[in-house]
UniProtKB/Swiss-Prot annotation:
Signal peptide: none annotated. Keywords: Membrane, Transmembrane, Transmembrane helix. The chain crosses the membrane at residues 46-66, 77-97, 108-128, 133-153, 163-183, 186-206, 226-246. It is a multi-pass membrane protein. The keyword Mitochondrion does not apply. This is Uncharacterized protein HVLF3. It is found in: Membrane. InterPro entries: Bax_inhibitor_1-related.
């Protein structure tokens, strides 16, 4: 179908008249829809930014004021030897989010509780892991977060399916390249399998950023932006924990399999 001065001419030759006012209304509606999507995106990712800033301030203050005997304490630092324990928090948060969505009326204090629920495992991470390790994992997670959400928010509406395919293809290629590197190392097969599985889970979590951004852009009304921000924040923290688990997996397997060299 092509358009000629207010007429729409299908390929079969039939002429359909569309008044110019209706065409302008359609353009205005699309523009307003785009503005509304931007408002929702700004509210949602602005809330995520405030959550990250608040948690960073809390963790920095705690680590600065914490006694020196707390760092790498044998009873406190279970992250390196058993990193799976910190995943209880994101799983619990998902359950609580489901309960929040089904509760009537919704309570904003519950959302604040979900956010603060992530402080204890992050405190343990900051106390027990090397600072360089935590910073590098956080930078990698934020880079993946900004890349996937940026593509979803800035790409035109007509390329939604295309950008989904492109993002998933890039993540698949990245996962394949990492697995090839892992298989070429001189580690045990147990370590290779567990590490590859953890990388797969992390890649899936990163791709979820893109899907969450698409949901925020096209489906989230403004009144539910805060709930969407909490969900995106949970994905962000979960991916950070997955990256840290991969980085500490060598120590984890050495502890449980008593291997001198993986």
């Amino acid at each position: 179908m092509r358009r000629e001065k207010g007429f729409q001419v299908p390929t079969d030759g039939t002429v359909i008249y569309v008044p110019p006012g209706i065409q302008e209304t359609r353009l205005a509606t699309r523009s307003l829809a785009w503005v509304d999507c931007c408002r929702v995106a700004l509210h949602t990712y602005g809330a995520v930014g405030w959550q990250l800033a608040g948690l960073t301030a809390l963790l920095s203050a705690f680590c600065y004021a914490a006694p020196a005997t707390w760092f790498h304490h044998s009873r406190l630092c279970l992250t390196e030897s058993s990193p799976s324990l910190v995943f209880v928090i994101p799983v619990t948060s998902v359950i609580f989010i489901h309960c929040y969505e089904t509760s009537h009326p919704s309570n904003i204090g519950v959302l604040l509780f979900y956010t603060l629920l992530h402080v204890p495992p992050l405190i343990v991470i900051c106390l027990c892991l090397d600072g360089t390790l935590v910073i590098s994992a956080a930078l990698f997670t934020l880079l993946a977060f900004l890349s996937c959400t940026g593509v979803a928010l800035l790409a035109p509406e007509r390329t939604v399916r295309r950008q989904i395919v492109v993002v998933h293809a890039l993540i698949t290629l990245t996962f394949t390249a990492i697995v090839v590197v892992i298989l070429r190392r001189g580690w045990s097969w147990c370590f290779k399998i567990v590490l590859s599985f953890s990388v797969l889970i992390t890649c899936l979590a990163v791709s979820h950023f893109h899907e969450a951004a698409l949901a925020v852009r096209y489906e989230t009304p403004l009144e539910r932006a805060l709930l969407a921000a909490v969900k995106v924040f949970l994905s962000l923290v979960f991916t950070l924990l997955m990256v840290l688990r991969i980085m500490t997996l060598r120590t984890f397997l050495q502890t449980y399999f008593s291997s001198d060299k993986l």
